[in-house]
């Protein structure tokens, strides 16, 4: 049996969830990820991994009406026996609905973000403007329509309790391969040398540093932690406006996007990992996948109390109020000043990850969902 996973833009970081689902399913079924590519190449962290991608270059046809000609090709490439749409977006879930209409197959929908929430960050007037943007295939009007059609899927999976309350479905959080990502397998000294670090105390942020991720708060917080504290931002574009602004601070070091499989080789260098989400419509339903990177690798974590993070890190992480730079700096200073306590916190985080947020835990839920869907054909 073959599973086709549909992603709405293979050049975007949303590819990360599709890549994870493919890795989870691959031991049991043939899997490939299908979708349009609005950028020049497949998203860098996923590009050279084990997952098979069948991307369709959009080029000049990125808006309606020209994009309408792409739908048939995208639906034809989703030729699996089971369809799994990643996100309720038109160019993933919408294409999956069309593919199912052409040839009846089970369709599962995976929701890992509140997509309409992303359009609300600019307030009422910004939302109004976006609601009139009919030319964007994944714009607000069409994404809103997809969320109204969630019930048409044969099964729904969600990545957070907020999303479960809004859309129903089975909870399948982001997870990590805790066997492959065993910190004992990676050389911490080598990782620090790669970053040009010696005895400095290192705080690390890993991910796509968008505004709602709270990186500005983190840069400010680390700046007051102490003269030997360094902040390493992995995944930040040094050439971007924000990247240049952050790099102007002497305590900040930037590393561009890295392959997903290289994450442990960088993250083990950290003395603490920060997940400083802000409280916005972007983050209310979001659980940052990178918190599980840190947990799997036994890193001490400081996070803001947003979405499911208090539940996930209960007893194995430090929580601070979102947007509170003073509280964030205080928590980081405490972790960096207590190596033994930090190590114990990291140990508990890894154990929690193995129990609840590992590949084994996710497959125990995901495999039966796919099997039930396949049996309904």
Indicate where each model-derived feature is located.
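Acidic anion/phosphate-binding donor-loop and adjacent secondary structure
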Residues: 176-194, 242-244
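Nucleotide-sugar-dependent
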Residues: 213, 259-266, 271-296, 303-311
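Nucleotide-activated donor-binding/catalytic signature segment of Leloir-type glycosyltransferases, i.e.
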Residues: 241-267
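Conserved acidic donor-binding segment of nucleotide-sugar-dependent glycosyltransferases
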Residues: 315-326, 334-340
């Amino acid at each position: 049996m073959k599973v086709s996973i549909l992603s709405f833009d293979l050049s975007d970081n949303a590819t990360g969830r599709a890549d994870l689902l493919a890795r989870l399913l691959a031991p049991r079924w043939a899997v490939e990820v299908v979708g349009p590519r609005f950028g020049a190449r497949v998203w860098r962290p996923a590009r050279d991994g084990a997952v098979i991608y069948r991307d369709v270059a959009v080029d000049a046809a990125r808006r309606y009406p020209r994009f309408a000609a792409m739908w048939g090709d995208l639906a034809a490439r989703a030729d699996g026996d089971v369809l799994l749409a990643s996100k309720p977006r038109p160019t993933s879930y919408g294409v999956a609905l069309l593919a199912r209409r052409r040839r009846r197959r089970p369709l599962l929908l995976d929701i890992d973000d509140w997509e309409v929430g992303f359009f609300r960050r600019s307030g009422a007037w910004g939302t109004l403007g976006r609601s009139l943007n009919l030319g964007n295939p994944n714009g607000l009007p069409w994404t809103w329509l997809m969320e109204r059609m969630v019930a048409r899927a044969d099964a729904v999976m969600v990545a957070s309790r907020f999303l479960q309350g809004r859309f129903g479905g089975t909870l399948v959080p982001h997870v990590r391969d805790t066997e492959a990502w065993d910190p004992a397998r990676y050389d911490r000294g080598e990782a620090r040398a790669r970053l040009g670090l010696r005895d400095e105390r290192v705080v690390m942020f890993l991910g796509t540093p968008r505004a709602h991720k709270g990186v500005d708060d983190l840069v400010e917080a680390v700046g007051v932690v102490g003269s030997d504290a360094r902040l390493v931002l992995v995944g930040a574009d040094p050439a971007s406006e924000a990247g240049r602004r952050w790099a102007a601070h002497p305590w900040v070091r930037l590393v561009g996007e890295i392959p997903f499989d290289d994450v442990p080789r960088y993250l083990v260098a950290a003395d603490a990992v920060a997940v400083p989400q802000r409280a916005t419509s972007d983050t209310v339903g979001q659980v940052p996948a990178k918190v599980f990177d840190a947990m799997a690798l036994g890193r001490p974590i400081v996070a803001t109390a947003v979405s499911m993070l208090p539940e996930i890190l209960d007893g194995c992480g430090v929580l601070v109020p979102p947007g509170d730079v003073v509280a964030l700096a205080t928590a980081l200073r405490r972790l960096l000043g207590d190596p033994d306590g930090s190590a114990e916190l990291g140990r508990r985080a890894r154990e929690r990850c193995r129990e609840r947020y590992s590949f084994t835990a996710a497959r125990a839920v995901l495999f039966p969902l796919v099997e039930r869907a396949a049996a309904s054909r």
